[in-house]
Design a protein with these regions (language model features):
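Short beta-strand-to-loop acidic/aromatic patch adjacent to the donor-nucleotide binding site
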Residues: 80-95
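Short, flexible, basic/aromatic active-site loop/helix in glycosyltransferases
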Residues: 136-171
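Active-site-adjacent helix/loop segment of glycosyltransferases
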Residues: 207-281
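Glycine-rich, basic loop-to-helix element that forms the pyrophosphate-binding segment
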Residues: 57-78
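A conserved acidic beta->alpha catalytic loop
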Residues: 20, 33-44, 60
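A short, conserved alpha-helix in the catalytic core of glycosyltransferases
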Residues: 164-166, 170-223
Length: 281
């Protein structure tokens, strides 16, 4: 088993995550941390080593997906004897619940046709985060984008979030905050698409898992807690812009036929206006 994560000026906040790994799996776990250009890399190395983790530099700020891909490369280069059947991809501000990795692996053993497995993700208040959702379509995406903030209960957002079923089920995609994936499948897919700097890289991956003939499965019996988006909290405006940029990239690829160019134009304009609206001072 290998656990891959990415840091960017994370500092001491990674300790709870590292401390939770041992209790999440009864099997040996190799932890690889790819750092995206932190100013405190030496301190991070010391923290990682104290928990038996391997810390490597990704070579720059490659975003979340690029950082995870760098961590997998480092796993091959630095720990060549580690040949895991599964990878747990996770944010560094996640605390893994007791036995959570074991529970995801058990689900994978029960469901050989499935490729990726997502736990139930709780926020700091203990509320379930909607981490297993349907793939966004144009109708759902536009409705969600237009009304999610002013009318949270709108039918498009409800369909997008698919929050009502905290039961084991298939989903279109799983949150990149924490999920288990078969190593062979992740390699087959070429890892994350690094053109998504941040946001929608998990949506894209979930779509490609489905296209490869595998399913994404929500496994709520495995529980983790997402303690907060540390690396994004310092620059919310930039992250909102990145979110809208990635949304356009995903939808423009989904509706890429040449005769849909007017639709892509409207999408770009609409998302640009929304980005300016939500980032206004």
């Amino acid at each position: 088993m290998a656990v891959l994560t990415v840091t960017y000026n994370t500092g001491e906040t990674i300790r709870p995550f590292l401390a939770s790994v041992a209790g999440a799996s009864t099997a040996p776990v190799a932890v690889v941390i790819a750092d995206n250009g932190s100013t405190d890399l030496d301190a991070l190395r010391a923290i990682g080593e104290s928990y038996g983790a391997t810390v490597v530099s990704s070579g720059g700020n490659r975003g979340y997906g690029g950082g995870i891909d760098a961590a997998l490369t480092a796993l091959d280069d630095v720990l060549p004897d580690v040949r895991p059947d599964f990878l747990l991809v996770t944010n560094p501000d996640v605390v893994l619940g007791p036995g959570s990795i074991d529970e995801l692996v058990r689900a994978a053993d029960r469901l050989p046709g499935a490729g990726a497995f997502g736990p139930r993700i709780l926020d700091e208040q203990g509320e379930t985060y909607p981490s297993a959702r349907q793939l966004p379509s144009l109708r759902t995406g536009l409705g969600h984008a237009a009304f999610s903030r002013v009318w949270p209960a709108n039918p498009w957002s409800q369909r997008y979030w698919s929050t009502t079923q905290v039961v084991e089920r298939e989903a279109g995609w799983l949150s990149g905050a924490c999920f288990l994936i078969r190593t062979s499948l992740f390699r087959q897919l070429g890892g994350f698409d690094e053109s998504y700097f941040m946001y929608f890289e998990d949506v894209d991956l979930g779509q490609r898992v489905g296209r490869a003939g595998r399913s994404n499965v929500y496994v709520p019996s495995a529980v983790v807690t997402h303690t907060g988006a540390h690396s994004t909290s310092s620059n919310r405006r930039r992250m909102e812009i990145e979110h809208h940029r990635s949304a356009y990239r995903y939808l423009s690829r989904k509706y890429r036929a040449w005769w849909l160019w007017p639709l892509r134009l409207v999408l770009r304009a609409g998302l640009s206006v929304r980005a300016r609206w939500v980032t206004r001072k």
